[in-house]
Amino acid sequence: MINGVYYNEISRDLDISSSTQCLRFLKETVIPSLANNGNNSTSIQYHGISKNDNIKKSVNKLDKQINMADRSLGLQQVVCIFSYGPHIQKMLSILEIFKKGYIKNNKKIYQWNKLTSFDIKREGRNELQEERLKVPILVTLVSDSEIIDLNLHSFTKQ
């Protein structure tokens, strides 16, 4: 039995088995704290991926998102792809297929990754033993140009 889901050592009211609820939490709470867009000079498109997503539809959606026409407003276009736990493998497959198709068209792509985690506390065999698990969260930012307006100090450039 799970006693609680924690992020940054703060208890969150999340059901870790509900991908919709967790992906919404990542989009609304976790990602804004990681990629600070303080001056709003970057247009960020979000794409949460679960293991049930269709690869072809997701790749097409990513392609549309990265080519959006917000540049006319002087905004830099960034796509934020994110997932957690058992969904990360599907996310990586979709991301690599998307990048392969994008680079195939002689376009350059820039990528930044951030790995963080949820902490889960489970009941042990007795009340004195508590089991702690980490559920990984992967956040990836991709753009067709260098990201200069986001605070990416915690991200690793790919």
Swiss-Prot record:
Name which cysteines form disulfide bonds.
none
Q: Which Pfam families match?
A: Alba (PF01918)
Tell me the GO molecular function terms: ribonuclease P activity; RNA binding; rRNA primary transcript binding
Q: What is the uppermost EC class here?
A: hydrolase
User: Which GO terms fall under biological process for this protein?
Assistant: intronic box C/D snoRNA processing; maturation of 5.8S rRNA; nuclear-transcribed mRNA catabolic process, RNase MRP-dependent; rRNA processing; tRNA 5'-leader removal; tRNA processing
List the keywords (alphabetical).
Answer: Coiled coil, Hydrolase, Nucleus, rRNA processing, tRNA processing
Q: Which residues form a coiled coil?
A: 51-71
Known catalytic reactions: Endonucleolytic cleavage of RNA, removing 5'-extranucleotides from tRNA precursor
What InterPro entries does this protein map onto?
DNA/RNA-bd_Alba-like
- Its main localization is nucleus
Q: E.C. number, please?
A: 3.1.26.5
Q: Can you say where in the cell this protein is located?
A: Nucleus
Q: Which GO terms describe its cellular component?
A: cytosol; nucleolar ribonuclease P complex; nucleus; ribonuclease MRP complex; telomerase holoenzyme complex
Q: How does it assemble?
A: Component of nuclear RNase P and RNase MRP complexes. RNase P consists of an RNA moiety and at least 9 protein subunits including POP1, POP3, POP4, POP5, POP6, POP7, POP8, RPP1 and RPR2. RNase MRP complex consists of an RNA moiety and at least 10 protein subunits including POP1, POP3, POP4, POP5, POP6, POP7, POP8, RMP1, RPP1 and SNM1, many of which are shared with the RNase P complex.
Q: Which function does this protein serve?
A: Component of ribonuclease P, a protein complex that generates mature tRNA molecules by cleaving their 5'-ends. Also a component of RNase MRP, which cleaves pre-rRNA sequences.
Reproduce the miscellaneous comment text: Present with 3180 molecules/cell in log phase SD medium.
Q: What is this protein called?
A: Ribonucleases P/MRP protein subunit POP6
Natural source organism: Saccharomyces cerevisiae (strain ATCC 204508 / S288c)
